[in-house]
């Protein structure tokens, strides 16, 4: 889902340098009774704000997974909501213990942080109006394209060499399409399904040759093997007992994101 662009690549480099500079330092004692996850609650059905969520006002697939990770390890899961591009910096600074935000695992990000095993596989798709003539990615060449800032869709469209406009919120991007201000929105498949369900007159167009599958993982600070082991054990359990599949089906069917 979410992959960093050139500006954030510089931030990743800065995070890596910070990690190297502090590698020999000692961390202050942390509260073992809580685990704080950073997220960007603008990505239904994975994370969004609602009247009553599984963790305070936060709900979605990722939020339910975060809560279960906390419970499996005898900790209370807490959420810090922030801009997506700030998440890994918050992780490096110790503001959060882990990041769960539908984050795509990439080699570039693995240089700066450690990732859990993948817990979800997604791909990029195109949302268009039902009468659109866009049938494949190359048909976007002369169209007005909208993407989400910092997300994988932005990287893909940029690599294709197409011009685009980026928005921070998925709802804003979709309203551009609904109101006829753009021709196509490039976004993650799971989120696309939810937006199409909630907005009449839209459809999803797939192009498996243009968009490769991507895997989501939970990020922790480089070298934090103790926490990473706890997260992976919990994820293993949830994948084996079908919890993650059940959550995916539940939240794909319905979410009351505000």
Where in this protein do the model-derived segments appear?
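C-terminal motif of bacterial Sec signal peptides marking the signal peptidase cleavage site
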Residues: 19-23
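A ligand-binding cleft/hinge motif common to bilobed small-molecule-binding domains
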Residues: 86, 103-111, 156, 183-213
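Periplasmic-binding protein-like
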Residues: 41, 121-128, 193-236, 252-258
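Extracytoplasmic small-molecule ligand-binding "clamshell" domains
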Residues: 29-102
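Flexible hinge/capping segments at coil-to-helix
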Residues: 128-145
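Ligand-binding clefts/hinges and TM-proximal coupling segments of bilobed small-molecule sensing domains
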Residues: 26-28, 76-78, 152-168, 203-210, ...
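Alpha-to-beta junction loops
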Residues: 74-76, 92-101, 144, 178-191, ...
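Short helix-initiation/N-cap motifs at beta->coil->alpha
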Residues: 61-63, 78-91, 132, 149-152, ...
């Amino acid at each position: 889902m979410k992959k960093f662009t050139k500006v954030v690549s510089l931030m990743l480099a800065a995070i890596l340098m910070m990690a190297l500079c502090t590698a020999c330092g000692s961390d202050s004692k942390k509260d073992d009774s809580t685990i704080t996850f950073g997220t960007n609650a603008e990505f239904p059905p994975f994370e969004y704000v609602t009247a009553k969520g599984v963790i305070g006002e936060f709900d979605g697939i990722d939020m339910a997974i975060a809560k279960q990770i906390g419970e499996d390890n005898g900790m209370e899961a807490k959420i810090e909501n922030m801009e997506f591009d700030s998440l890994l910096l918050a992780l490096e600074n110790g503001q959060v213990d882990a990041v769960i935000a539908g984050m795509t695992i990439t080699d570039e990000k693995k240089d700066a942080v450690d990732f859990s095993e993948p817990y979800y596989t997604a791909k990029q798709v195109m949302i268009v109006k039902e009468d659109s003539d866009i049938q494949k990615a190359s048909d976007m060449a002369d169209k007005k394209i909208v993407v989400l800032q910092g997300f994988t869709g932005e990287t893909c469209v940029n690599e294709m060499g197409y011009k685009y406009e980026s928005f921070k919120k998925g709802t804003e991007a979709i309203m551009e399409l609904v109101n006829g201000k753009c021709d196509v929105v490039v976004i993650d498949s799971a989120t696309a399904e939810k937006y199409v369900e909630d907005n009449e007159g839209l459809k999803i167009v797939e192009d498996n040759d243009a968009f490769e599958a991507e895997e989501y993982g939970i990020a922790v600070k480089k070298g934090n093997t103790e926490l990473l082991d706890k997260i992976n054990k919990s994820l293993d359990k949830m994948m084996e007992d079908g919890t993650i599949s059940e959550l995916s089906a539940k939240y794909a069917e319905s979410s009351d994101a505000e």
